[in-house]
């Protein structure tokens, strides 16, 4: 059954972007799913599944972040001490949450407004709870604009999950949290189409990766004021 999903995903990427990217993506999808023992590849149209909140028109399709990009980002973050608490906005089926545990994060939260995706995320991180018993995993099924950021969360992950309206609201919540509890914050943003929102809010880009034209990752930071 998973082989069928790989074919569909390869075709989806090839038709919409390029077949070179499709072959690259499928290679890393198969490698990553096997390496981390996950089931996160299947595409989902959000309009066909149950959504919590009123912001579905600000989102479109569930698609997990490419494993190559994800691992490169976490490898960079490993060099920066103190990054242990991660929030994944639009966590989907929990790929980022699961992989983050392998890179030393001890508190990992995923937020998504699609109930079916949250259930899938719970299933995927369940194995990681056994593998990393000291790591706290929490999947929250809610609209990200309603999420109350924890005072010690310092890494925030995005994979272009929302449009500018939702992203502005989430960035505002992050800034409010940083003012209330001053700390260094890091943004890990794959396919960063709204990167300017963070830069305008005082974040500085520390790392940028671009692969095969379409795969992009930006890591930005903001020091405590």
Features from the language model and the residues they span:
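Conserved class I S-adenosyl-L-methionine
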Residues: 83-90
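S-adenosyl-L-methionine
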Residues: 1-81, 119-151
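A short SAM/SAH-binding and catalytic strip from SAM-dependent methyltransferases
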Residues: 153-165
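Short beta-strand element of Class I
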Residues: 106-111
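Glycine-rich SAM-binding Motif I of class I
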Residues: 94-98
